[in-house]
């Protein structure tokens, strides 16, 4: 039994049975079921995320992400005392997901406990586990916006955390755009942290020392010594000292090289006895065999060691079984093979000579071939690269990881090119199946071994553990809440869908024992998403580079909706913005549905005064005014429930079946009525190539027809929103333009909706132009949906520097030019240039504004005159990419006024602060606890619906009895939301012909109605 919302055409619609279809090569419609597990095989492209970060974070004047901007903002946050939200009820509750992790570049098993470890995400902070990673707790003493790159624990127990990674920083080749803040230390097992003196970048630029610290290592011999590989060299540091012990590697004292080491230290490994070091600096490799006192450059042009003298980046590993055995894996740094494996090498004589053990991986190869950094479209060894030696007395083995992990074994005295064994898969099991024991999330960045010989891997999906040297894996992400969301959507019950970086489109259905559990619906990067507020089984989502998917059953099956552009092309925008408009009662609709009832329609009444004449005569039948009839919608798979306002007359021929009786048989009804289809729904998707709209988002008996409504897009689309009445579509661009497309309520045909057509009815106007991407658009819904378009529109603007990050126009729907969006971002001067990514105007009091920024959420209760920080409750200072509020009436949803926040690093949050304060009382005043019980259609032939009004959210019981009192069927539903026209469907196909009574109970209240079953 399902509870559905009805749409009356004042209006109610119920969904008929539906299925998924696509068009095959012959143009025929065919069923297309795609299991979730197949979508999980789709890989991500890391450069796409970089592209998007640059579009919304870059300095509005230079077009680049500037390190100085980030530093000045972070310093201001620490030094300036911010006003807190005046109403302390603005508290945020984490919704998770608590079973999905985020990008992890550092894992540290702690020495004081065999089951304690710390893991660090590039956004979201540090987390600690005391049960081997089974569950995690946030270390609140560490700033969540710092990029964690490496962790180490000294022999004296001190824990160090390095920040900033060369694979994340803005080096001009495309990265996430953030550099580090230096080196931090904790002397209390991670409870509190402080910046180590002289280890903060100053000035805060990419070339400043400590801008990136890719790797730190504890000295195995000296319990007070830490080795640091930064962007400008390799250092030794004594715990507690105020200055560096400058290592000889940073000077010119290298035995066979006079060129100073000023390139970023990419990787370091130290033997367990502390004597052998191997260091990668830029494209040079150095080895020390005396505890780091002296180094030798081993891959110079005339070294003849067998190593290449140039490469893009590299990882190193010293055997955990034999210090003389070491490994090096390299990545191509430029050209068509950029990001592919350049070669993997092994040495068995302490690094004197090296042998190739894996050649350059096949460029453009298939996923089944050995290509550890290839994701099916591009290679990204520059981004994800891991190499580790397996501690094993019985075999000498290594694991090389990137997109997937591969194992290699040394089987002879002289290493050579031998087979590599793939040890994990990047796709999960299918729905309802147990987790795959070999699943590890793609994009593998780091590894760590604990004292029990367990291997941990840090990935874009969090932490994984193997207890058998990579043979099988366990996901360790419970409460490791570090997911990076791009966009979110919700349904009337508060269930949430969100698009994430490299973690799919995630669905939180709030069911089961863990309401923070999320299910992945499609693989790769999930970006834009929407959910119907009237048919919540319908959900829309997109994948990186433009592909749009849809589900009609809340994620049980997901199918391709439409390819509006060449799908998956690297030239497409990384993200796809989308906007769904739903109006259940559009008085301006020009869509009319033909209606001709069957002669046995239960709604027809035959005039009693018609004289029965010989066969062939015509009689008049009518549907009386006030009747509620059901009609199939035009080109959308739902049923209109229409209340007849005046009698509708139809005409029918009849014949006598027996000349001596009045038994009649009627032929088809002759006339057709045309009924206005007031419920109207539109779905828009925006790309650089153009903006597309369909009026058939719920069509499944074929492919929804999309129209190109605008092809003048100046740049990437970064935001979209409809006006409440659906007459205007607002489109924001990376270039800083805001465009209004108008007259959708006058455009109903293909010609009227297709740009370039002679009958094109839409009007395009640029209504704002400025610096910084338009990251969000919010329209004032406080005036309802059918009283003309709301003139009041707010926008948020991304990018560091500049001003006016939140702007409002009071005439956005009618203005004919630019200049009406006024700056309402009245924050302390230090924060005027903070990027804003999202904005909400409260449905009940539009002077209440919430802004999602680079560092959390801000609140204004006076239309932007003043602002205060609103990171209360469980919210922290992380980027908030999406803020959305439930705008539907409180009697139709259970989450009216609730605001949801999608963060890029700490998952999803919600606040009930703006929940309509009198919603329950209002409902109770207007609607009895239980009222207006109806069965339709009545008589019933097979399926039917029971409609009722419910004054409060409650558990309900439904009983169906035969006329003689026998119980035929019983149903129970928990926590049915308050509202009018609640609906329960039932199937009477197996009922005998006759009369029945339906009884509905809510606590001590009950109501009943009769219905008849016929055939």
Question: Which residues fall in each region the model found?
Answer:
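Glycine-rich, phosphate-binding/catalytic loops in enzymes
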Residues: 514, 917-920, 977
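Hydrophobic membrane-insertion alpha-helices, especially the h-region
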Residues: 9-20
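N-terminal Sec-pathway targeting helices
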Residues: 1-11
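Low-complexity, Pro/Thr/Ser/Gly/Ala-rich linker/spacer regions in secreted
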Residues: 914-928
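C-terminal outer-membrane/trafficking sorting elements
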Residues: 924-936, 940-1015
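Beta-propeller blade termini and top-face loops
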Residues: 19-20, 25-915
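Ser/Thr- (and often Asn-) enriched beta-sheet segments in non-cytosolic proteins
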Residues: 192-194, 294-296, 353-355, 557-559, ...
């Amino acid at each position: 039994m399902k509870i559905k919302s009805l749409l009356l055409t004042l209006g109610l619609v119920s969904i008929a049975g539906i299925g998924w279809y696509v068009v095959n090569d012959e143009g025929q419609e065919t069923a297309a079921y795609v299991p979730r597990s197949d979508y999980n095989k789709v890989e991500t492209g890391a450069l796409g995320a970089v592209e998007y970060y640059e579009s919304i974070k870059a300095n509005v004047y230079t077009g680049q992400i500037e390190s100085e901007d980030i530093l000045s903002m972070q310093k201001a946050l620490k030094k300036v005392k911010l006003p807190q939200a005046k109403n302390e009820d603005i508290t945020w509750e984490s919704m998770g997901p608590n079973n999905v992790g985020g990008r992890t570049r550092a894992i540290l098993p702690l020495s004081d406990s065999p089951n304690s470890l710390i893991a660090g995400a590039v956004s979201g902070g540090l987390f600690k586990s005391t049960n081997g990673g089974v569950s995690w707790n946030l270390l609140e003493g560490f700033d969540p916006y710092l990029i964690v790159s490496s962790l180490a624990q000294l022999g004296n127990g001190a824990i160090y955390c390095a920040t900033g990674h060369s694979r994340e920083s803005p080096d001009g080749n495309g990265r996430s755009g953030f550099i580090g803040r230096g080196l931090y230390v904790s002397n209390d097992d991670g409870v509190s942290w402080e910046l180590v003196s002289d280890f903060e970048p100053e000035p805060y630029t990419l070339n400043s020392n400590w801008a990136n610290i890719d790797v730190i290592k504890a000295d195995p011999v000296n319990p007070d010594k830490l080795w640091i590989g930064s962007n400008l060299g390799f250092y030794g540091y004594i715990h507690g000292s105020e200055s560096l012990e400058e290592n000889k590697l940073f000077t010119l004292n290298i035995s066979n090289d006079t060129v100073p080491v000023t390139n970023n230290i990419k990787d370091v490994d130290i033997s367990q006895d502390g004597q052998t070091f191997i260091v990668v600096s830029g494209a040079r490799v150095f080895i020390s065999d005396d505890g780091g006192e002296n180094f030798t450059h081993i891959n110079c042009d005339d070294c003849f060691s067998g190593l290449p003298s140039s490469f893009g980046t590299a990882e190193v590993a010293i055997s955990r079984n034999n210090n003389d055995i070491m490994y090096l894996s390299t990545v191509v740094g430029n050209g068509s093979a950029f990001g592919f494996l350049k070669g993997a090498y092994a040495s068995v004589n302490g690094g004197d000579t090296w042998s190739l053990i894996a050649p350059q991986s096949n460029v453009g190869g298939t996923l089944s071939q050995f290509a550890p950094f290839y994701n099916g479209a591009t290679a990204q060894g520059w981004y994800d690269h891991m190499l580790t030696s397996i501690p094993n007395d019985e075999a000498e083995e290594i694991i090389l990881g990137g997109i997937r992990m591969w194992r290699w074994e040394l089987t002879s005295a002289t290493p050579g090119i031998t087979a590599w064994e793939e040890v994990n898969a990047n796709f999960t099991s299918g729905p309802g199946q147990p987790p795959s024991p070999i699943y590890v999330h793609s994009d593998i960045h780091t590894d760590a071994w604990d004292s029990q010989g367990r291997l941990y891997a840090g990935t874009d999906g969090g932490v994984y553990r193997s207890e058998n040297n990579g043979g099988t894996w366990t996901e360790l992400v419970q409460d490791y809440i570090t997911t990076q969301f791009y966009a979110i959507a919700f349904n009337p019950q508060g269930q949430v869908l969100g698009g994430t970086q490299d973690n799919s489109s995630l669905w939180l259905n709030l069911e089961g024992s863990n309401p923070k559990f999320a299910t992945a619906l499609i693989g790769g990067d999930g970006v834009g998403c929407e959910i119907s507020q009237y048919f919540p089984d319908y959900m829309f989502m997109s994948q990186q580079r433009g592909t749009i998917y849809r589900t009609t059953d809340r994620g049980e099956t997901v199918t391709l909706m439409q390819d509006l552009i060449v799908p998956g092309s690297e030239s497409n925008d990384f993200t796809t913005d989308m906007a769904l408009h739903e109006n259940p009662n559009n008085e301006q609709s020009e869509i009319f549905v033909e209606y001709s009832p069957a002669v046995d329609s239960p709604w027809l009444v035959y005039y009693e005064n018609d004289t029965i004449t010989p066969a062939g005569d015509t009689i008049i039948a009518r549907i009386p005014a006030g009747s509620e009839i059901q009609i199939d919608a035009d080109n959308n798979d739902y049923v209109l429930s229409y209340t007849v306002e005046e009698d509708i007359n139809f005409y029918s021929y009849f014949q006598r079946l027996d000349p001596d009786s009045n038994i009649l048989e009627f032929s088809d009804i002759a006339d057709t009525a045309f009924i206005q289809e007031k419920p109207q729904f539109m779905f828009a998707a925006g790309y650089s190539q153009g903006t597309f709209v369909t009026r058939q988002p719920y069509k499944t008996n074929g492919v929804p027809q999309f129209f190109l409504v605008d092809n003048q897009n100046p740049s990437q689309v970064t935001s979209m929103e409809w006006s409440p009445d659906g007459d205007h579509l607002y489109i924001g661009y990376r270039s800083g333009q805001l465009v209004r497309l108008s007259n959708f309520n006058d455009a109903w045909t293909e010609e009227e909706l297709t740009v370039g057509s002679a009958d094109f009815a839409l009007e395009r106007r640029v209504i704002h132009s400025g610096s910084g991407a338009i990251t969000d658009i919010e329209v004032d819904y406080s005036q309802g949906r059918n009283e003309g378009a709301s003139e009041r529109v707010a926008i948020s603007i991304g990018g560091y520097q500049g001003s006016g990050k939140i702007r409002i126009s009071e005439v956005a729907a009618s203005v004919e030019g630019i200049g009406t969006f006024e700056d309402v971002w009245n924050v302390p001067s230090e924060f005027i240039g903070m990027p804003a990514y999202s904005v909400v105007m409260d449905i009940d009091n539009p002077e209440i504004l919430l802004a999602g920024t680079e560092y959390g959420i801000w609140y204004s209760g006076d239309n932007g005159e003043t602002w205060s920080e609103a990171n209360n409750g469980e919210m922290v200072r992380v980027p908030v990419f999406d803020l959305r509020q439930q705008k539907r009436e409180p009697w139709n949803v259970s989450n009216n006024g609730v605001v949801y926040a999608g963060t890029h690093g700490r998952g999803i949050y919600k606040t009930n602060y703006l929940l309509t304060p009198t919603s329950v009382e209002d409902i109770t005043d207007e609607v009895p606890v239980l009222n207006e019980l109806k069965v339709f259609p009545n008589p019933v032939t097979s399926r039917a619906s029971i409609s009722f009004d419910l004054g409060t959210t409650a558990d309900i019981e439904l009983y169906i009895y035969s006329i003689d009192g026998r119980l035929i069927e019983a149903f129970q539903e928990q926590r049915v939301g308050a509202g009018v026209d609640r609906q329960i469907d039932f199937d009477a196909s197996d009922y005998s012909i006759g009369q029945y009574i339906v009884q509905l109970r809510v606590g001590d209240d009950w109501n009943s109605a009769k219905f008849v079953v016929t055939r």
